[in-house]
Amino acid sequence: MMSYSARILSAYEKKVSLYEILSEKISALLEGLIQDEGLYVHSIYHRVKQRDSLSRKLNKPDASYKKLGDLTDIAGVRVITYFSSDVDRVADIIRREFTVDTEHSIDKGALLDPDRFGYLSLHYVVSLGKSHTKFPQDKQLASLKAEIQIRSILQHAWAEIEHDLGYKSKHAIPIHMRRRFSRLSGLLELADYEFDGLRTNLREYSEEVAAAQGIDIPLDKISLTHVIKHGDLVRMLDNEIRNQTGLELVFEDWFAESLIEKLLFVGISRLSDLEAGLRHRSDVITRFAIEHLKGRTYSRIHRGVSIYYFCTGLLAESGNEDRLLEYLETFRLGEPANRKRFARGIIEKYQSAGDPHG
């Protein structure tokens, strides 16, 4: 008579291809559902337990499995989020879209005593449910279960390091090292909490910037991006440069961020100073930009291009070639071997733009 273990392994070999289809399908579904929710996660993995791994699990002293269906982690999917609060948002999607086996699902965070060493994650045992098994080829998947793990990226880092070190229980750790493990666990949990808080604060600040019309605020990525996207003056100047050059005008996050250091280099640290400088030099900035872009092989320019030429123009306006050269070298503008000539050309073009009749 075959043992339970042998029967399960035999059933596994017959159904392993179905479990592979199941894990891949759940992974693809989650990817689409998470994207539809407007969430961005670090990664989604799927796997099927290997035969050797299954055999070891079945032969553990406390194993009590009698059939393949008793094992709920043959197919597995892992979702790793950037933020711990997104773990709960992914969990909401899973509860809404899949049939959850609550008896076998685990919230590991709820199992932790305050003084117990360990870390958090959610484990849901699910089946596809009727909404995701409408097609005939999916019917054979309906009775199968899979385990979905959800962790933040820091929770995942802890779990991986913990596994690599080989200590999953605080009692297995040498007593003189337990405090160090506990401190590390607490630090990671605190870091998760702080990253969540930072994201919330950045969102709130972004809303404050959007509402702060006419209020002077410091220059940073959020405030400058808002000006580039929504500021009337910058939009007018950028559009004029686009119209005169015929180049496509696009917004790219990296370009907006690169302007911050350039503005700080020329002494602009507040939006009020930027606004005043642009307004005072609006005509010369557009003429300078249009002249400088003549003959270039660019197919497009970036929103905020007027600010880029404002920074260069401020230095050209001073006539200080050494300072302009330092600026070009700092931001790696122009060919290194020709930067002196490039700097002189910038000054000449700016002076010419400042005298439209010259």
Language-model segments: which ranges?
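An acidic, glycine-/histidine-flanked metal-binding catalytic module
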Residues: 2-12, 16-18, 142-283, 358
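Long beta-strand-rich cores associated with HINT superfamily self-processing modules
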Residues: 81-197
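Generic, well-ordered alpha-helical scaffold segments in large soluble proteins
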Residues: 29-33, 93, 194, 201
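Amphipathic, soluble alpha/beta structural segments
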Residues: 113-136, 176-209, 286-329
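The conserved glycine-aromatic submotif of the RRM
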Residues: 75-76, 120
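Charge-rich, low-complexity segments
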Residues: 1-74, 81, 85, 211, ...
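Short acidic, glycine/proline-enriched loop segments that cap or flank alpha-helices
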Residues: 67, 134-136, 247, 251
